[in-house]
């Protein structure tokens, strides 16, 4: 058996030969900061490259770089804050059987959330109307208000994807302004949006889209939307000549006897 003095000498030689490991500092444990990355909260959203995020807002970029100078030149604005812009977009969908059909209401909310990228709220009756069998606080539909980047993204998809996919589309009416530069448009089928699958649509529903702008007149509001790409059709009492699409003429079919039929 080894003596205590021998054990003490061997232990001292062992510790002298191998120096203890230094504890890593907190600065070494942290990873280097990410550059050109959009930071998001930990809500299940994946980090996105900044360059890719900027590409998705092409309509907002076009407004800042191209549309503002064009409007300043045409309407002779002195201050840049006088240039009209889209302030908000309200999307609402009326559901007649919302009180009796909870599944239909939830399906409509899911569709609107997919289309707009924002969860809608339920709209309820403010007063009871016996003629229409409506009680106070009864759910009548859903609505969502869009602002900022979500608003520009929805407007871009509405103009360039949804409206051209509408059956027999001949342009939107230029006479749907309210006199203060705000524009309203109706979409008959939510299936024109690419986010909605045709096989998953249980019932065809329409929606109303109200575009609120800071324009002082319908002429300024129509020019703003026309520069953004809104396909206004010819005629309809519009206040400007911003026409993108022309109305198609009806074709005549002739039978064997040469008589024209419409």
From Swiss-Prot:
It is found in: Plastid, Chloroplast. Residues 1-39 form a transit peptide. Its main location: plastid. GO terms for biological process: translation. One of its GO terms (molecular function) is structural constituent of ribosome. GO terms for cellular component: chloroplast; chloroplast envelope; chloroplast stroma; cytosol; cytosolic ribosome; ribonucleoprotein complex. Signal peptide: none annotated. Keywords: Chloroplast, Plastid, Ribonucleoprotein, Ribosomal protein, RNA-binding, rRNA-binding, Transit peptide. Transmembrane segments: none annotated. InterPro entries: Ribosomal_uL5, Ribosomal_uL5_bac-type, Ribosomal_uL5_C, Ribosomal_uL5_CS, Ribosomal_uL5_dom_sf, Ribosomal_uL5_N. HAMAP family: Ribosomal_uL5_B. Part of the 50S ribosomal subunit; contacts the 5S rRNA. Belongs to the universal ribosomal protein uL5 family. Binds 5S rRNA, forms part of the central protuberance of the 50S subunit. NCBIfam families: PRK00010.1 (NF000585). This is Large ribosomal subunit protein uL5c. It comes from Arabidopsis thaliana.
């Amino acid at each position: 058996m080894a003596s205590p003095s021998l054990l003490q000498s061997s232990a001292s030689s062992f510790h002298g030969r191998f120096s203890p490991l230094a504890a890593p500092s907190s600065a070494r444990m942290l990873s280097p900061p990410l550059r050109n990355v959009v930071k998001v909260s930990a809500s299940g959203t994946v980090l996105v490259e900044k360059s890719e995020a900027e590409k998705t807002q092409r309509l907002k970029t076009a407004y800042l770089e191209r549309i503002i100078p064009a409007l300043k030149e045409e309407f002779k604005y002195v201050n840049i804050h006088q240039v009209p812009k889209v302030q908000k977009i309200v999307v609402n969908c009326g559901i007649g059987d919302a009180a009796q059909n909870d599944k239909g209401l939830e399906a409509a909310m899911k569709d609107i959330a997919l289309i707009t990228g924002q969860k809608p709220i339920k709209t309820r009756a403010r007063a009871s109307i016996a003629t229409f069998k409506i009680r106070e606080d009864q759910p009548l539909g859903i609505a969502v208000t869009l602002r900022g980047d979500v608003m520009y993204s929805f407007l871009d998809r509405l103009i360039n994807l949804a409206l051209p996919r509408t059956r027999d589309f001949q342009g939107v009416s230029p006479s749907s302004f309210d006199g203060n530069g705000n524009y309203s448009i109706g979409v008959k089928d939510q299936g024109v949006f690419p986010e909605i699958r045709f096989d998953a649509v249980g019932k065809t529903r329409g929606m109303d889209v109200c575009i609120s702008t800071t324009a002082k007149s319908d002429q300024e509001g129509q020019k703003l939307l026309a520069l953004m790409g809104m396909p206004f059709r010819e005629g309809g009492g519009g206040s400007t000549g911003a026409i993108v699409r022309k109305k198609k003429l009806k074709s005549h079919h002739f039978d064997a006897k040469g008589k024209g039929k419409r």
